[in-house]
Amino acid sequence: MRKILLLICSLLVFACSTAPKKTGEIFDLRKRAEAQLVQGNKQANHGNLDNAMLFLDEAVRLAALTDDPGLRIRAGISRSNVLFSLGRSGEAVEGWNESLNEAVHTGDREMAAVCRVHISRGKLLSPGGNVQAQAVRDEVNRDLALIKSDRLYIAFAWMVIGLAERDLGRYAQAEAALRRSLDIHEKDSNFELAAYNWFLIASFRSLSGDYGKARQALESAIAFDRRVENSWGLANDWRAMGDVQKKAGDRESSRAAYTRAAGIFRALDLEEAAADALSRIDA
């Protein structure tokens, strides 16, 4: 709670002035919007969704003040991603479509493609979305050809393709797509997202029954999440490790992994998630 209050106070410092902006201040607004966007995305990657919304609400507000279409689109996409993670899918879809309309209106074909990729991911991860997997895979593959300048969005598109391949039961192709995403994240030192790539690769390997290699992938995810102190990622990695070890028949290692996950969740004040991890021990 104290962290949230401090964050609100820091946002209020930017929000209180209502005087007209001087011409030179527009560049300061852009810098502040970019800073809020970076922090919002980082908070989201660490599972701090409520804090992420505070940063991203401010990023959207500052982007509106600059009237910079590209900045407005990127801030809108990130905010919609968090809304989707919070279960507010209707608002998320509305936000993605607003960003898409902005991109189309300004003639930005690349950012329009980026918006469509996010919309496709939303379809795929919605209830019953697996029936659309082939259509989503084809749509994202077409849009990927239009994304040239932003490596982060290219990596994201490959991840969505991988998820679609997973839903189609093509686990080797799913991992190949995630490897394309992983290669970008590792080269760009984006270790939080590299950890998530390994987490997904582990899930693909587990689904295919290769529990030994799934464990290796989770060990890589844990190493990256430790490197960036992503406690949320670590808790999920260890819970997944418990699942994999249980499927492999190693009950002792499974229990240890679930217990470790629960300890991290509890340290994050996520008692429900901690209870879920412990409940899997004897399930």
Question: Language model features by range: what are they?
Answer:
Residues 1-14:
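Sec-dependent bacterial lipoprotein signal peptides
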Residues 16-70, 74:
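N-terminal leader/linker segments that initiate helical-solenoid repeat arrays
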Residues 24-27, 64-68, 104-108, 146-150, ...:
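Short coil/turn linkers that connect adjacent helices within long alpha-helical scaffolds
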Residues 36, 43, 55, 62, ...:
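TPR/Sel1-like alpha-solenoid repeat signature
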Residues 47, 87, 127-128, 169, ...:
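Residue-level detector of the short coil/turn that links helix A to helix B
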Residues 52, 92, 132-136, 174, ...:
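Single-residue signature of alpha-solenoid repeat helices
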Residues 95, 99, 130-144:
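Alpha-helical repeat scaffolds
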Residues 251-269:
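TPR/TPR-like (Sel1-like) alpha-helical repeat modules
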